[in-house]
Every structure is written in C-alpha cells, then in structure tokens.
C-alpha cells in the first residue's frame, strides 16, 4: 500500500486516535462493567502520542494511573462507511500501544455521567511502539500481548479473545468518523490492568513481533 507520508513516524503526523473500550470479556468482568452490543468509543488527541524513548507522564491531578496494553491498527488510506469485508484493505500496519488511564479520574467521571476525556486524553497517554508493517502480522487475531511493570508480568492476553473483530471495528468506526491515512485505532485491552507509579518501568510486547519500554515520570501539571 503506497503511502504519501512515512508511516514509520505515524505519531508525528497522524490525526486521530480512536479507542475501543470493553473489547475483551475478561477485562469487562474485572472492571465490573457490562458487555455491550456495539463497541464503546472514545478519542485521544495526537498530543497523547509518546514514542519509545520518551517518558510516560503521570498527570499532577491523577493519583491512580493504570496501564492498559492494546493492539493498535494503523490506517493506510482515507475511508468512510467502509464495508466490513473490505476493511483490512485499509490497514497499513500495526503498533503496540498503551492506553494510559487516570483511573481515579475516570471513576469520578463515570459517577457524574461525564465523558472520559480527563482520564484518557492527557499528554503522553498513548505510548506506542515502532510501526509494524501489515505483512509482518498475517493474522492480527492470533497474537499474544503482554505487559510487565518493573519485571513483573501484569497483563497477558490473546487478540483472538476480542469481542469485536478488527474488520468490524474499522467498519463501525468509519460510519461515524471519517478515517484518514495515519489514523490509529486501539482495539481494547485484556485483563490485568493495574496501577503504576513514578519511576516505574513498563515493558510490553507482542510475542515474536515487537516490544517497547517506558519510564514513568510525574508531570508538573
């Protein structure tokens, strides 16, 4: 798939980060939530990107920052109302991603019936790995994701456990949001989410594909 911009640096120019919540039943259970008939969507700004080598910044207003490891899907061309059967034709590649979440803030937002923006969209809330070309992952539904904090395994799960498949998600999202080249879709997290603190080291990976490391620092704001 020809690209007019370097997908290897997607975090520098990609516009939209679309996130899917509640896409693994075991995570839905641990969060005491309910599996819904359609994907739960929320957005992160492009300033949420944190490529490997930069720190994960814990907002000053957050007292309970959680890690969520996810498979990210990179779009290679513009599309709207994409048929599910053609959805994979729009995929240029993948990235391992973290959906960093201010859990205490999110819980307050839920209680008040407010959007999750304060909990999900802060600077560096979307750490990402290097770009992985589509050809290196023949089946994105046959991957093992894992995450460690200070060497301790916290999360592991298989993408085969997704409730909504990647083609379905792409099609569903594109009927609401026009997707563009360089856009990233986070496809949900398996169970095992948990807290991190300042100076922790997060290591995450996709077995046999890619891994990444990040240090956690406290933001001044």
UniProtKB/Swiss-Prot annotation:
GO terms of molecular function: acetylpyruvate hydrolase activity; acylpyruvate hydrolase activity; fumarylpyruvate hydrolase activity; metal ion binding; oxaloacetate decarboxylase activity; oxaloacetate tautomerase activity
Function, in words: Tautomerase that converts enol-oxaloacetate, a strong inhibitor of succinate dehydrogenase, to the physiological keto form of oxaloacetate. It is thereby required to maximize aerobic respiration efficiency by preventing succinate dehydrogenase inhibition. Also acts as a weak oxaloacetate decarboxylase (ODx), catalyzing the decarboxylation of oxaloacetate (OAA) to pyruvate and CO(2), and as such is likely a regulatory enzyme in the TCA cycle. Also displays acylpyruvase activity, being able to hydrolyze acetylpyruvate and fumarylpyruvate in vitro.
Subunit note: Homodimer.
GO BP annotation list: oxaloacetate metabolic process; pyruvate metabolic process
Phenotype of null mutants: Elevated oxaloacetate levels. No other visible phenotype.
Post-translational modification N6-succinyllysine, affected residues: 112
UniProt xrefs under InterPro entries: Fumarylacetoacetase-like_C, Fumarylacetoacetase_C_sf
NCBIfam families, alphabetized: PRK10691.1
PTM-bearing positions, type Phosphoserine: 37
UniProt entry keywords in alphabetical sequence: Acetylation, Cytoplasm, Hydrolase, Isomerase, Lyase, Magnesium, Manganese, Metal-binding, Mitochondrion, Phosphoprotein, Transit peptide
The organism of origin for this protein: Mus musculus (Mouse)
Name of this protein: Oxaloacetate tautomerase FAHD1, mitochondrial
GO cellular component: cytosol; mitochondrial inner membrane; mitochondrial matrix; mitochondrion; nucleoplasm
Binding site for oxalate: 22, 120
Tissue: Ubiquitous with higher expression in the liver and the kidney (at protein level).
Cofactor list: Mg(2+); Mn(2+)
Assigned EC number: 5.3.2.2, 3.7.1.5, 4.1.1.112
Cofactor: how and how many bound: Requires a divalent metal cation for activity.
Reactions mediated catalytically: oxaloacetate = enol-oxaloacetate; oxaloacetate + H(+) = pyruvate + CO2; a 3-acylpyruvate + H2O = a carboxylate + pyruvate + H(+); acetylpyruvate + H2O = acetate + pyruvate + H(+)
Protein family according to the UniProt entry: Belongs to the FAH family.
Localization terms from the record: Mitochondrion; Cytoplasm, Cytosol
Residues where N6-acetyllysine is found: 110
PANTHER family for this protein: ACYLPYRUVASE, ACYLPYRUVASE FAHD1, MITOCHONDRIAL
Regulation of protein activity: Oxaloacetate decarboxylation is potently and competitively inhibited by oxalate.
């Amino acid at each position: 798939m020809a690209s007019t911009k370097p997908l290897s640096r997607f975090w520098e120019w990609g516009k939209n980060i679309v996130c899917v919540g509640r896409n693994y039943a075991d995570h839905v259970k641990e969060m005491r939530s309910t599996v819904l008939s359609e994907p739960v969507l929320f957005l992160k700004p492009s300033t949420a990107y944190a490529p490997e080598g930069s720190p994960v910044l814990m907002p000053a207003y957050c007292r309970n920052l959680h890690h969520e490891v996810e498979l990210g899907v990179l779009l290679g061309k513009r599309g709207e109302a994409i048929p599910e059967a053609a959805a994979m034709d729009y995929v240029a590649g993948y990235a391992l991603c973290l959906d960093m979440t201010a859990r205490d803030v999110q819980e307050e937002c839920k209680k008040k019936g407010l959007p999750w923006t304060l909990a999900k969209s802060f600077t560096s809330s979307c750490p990402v790995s290097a770009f992985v070309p589509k050809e290196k992952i023949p089946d994105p539904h046959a991957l093992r994701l894992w995450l460690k904090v200070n060497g301790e395994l916290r999360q592991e799960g298989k993408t085969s456990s997704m409730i909504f498949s990647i083609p379905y998600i792409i099609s569903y999202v594109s009927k609401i949001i026009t997707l563009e080249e360089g856009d990233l879709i986070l496809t949900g997290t398996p169970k095992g989410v948990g807290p991190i603190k300042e100076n922790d080291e997060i290591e995450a990976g996709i077995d046999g594909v890619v891994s990444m490391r990040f240090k956690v620092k406290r933001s001044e704001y």
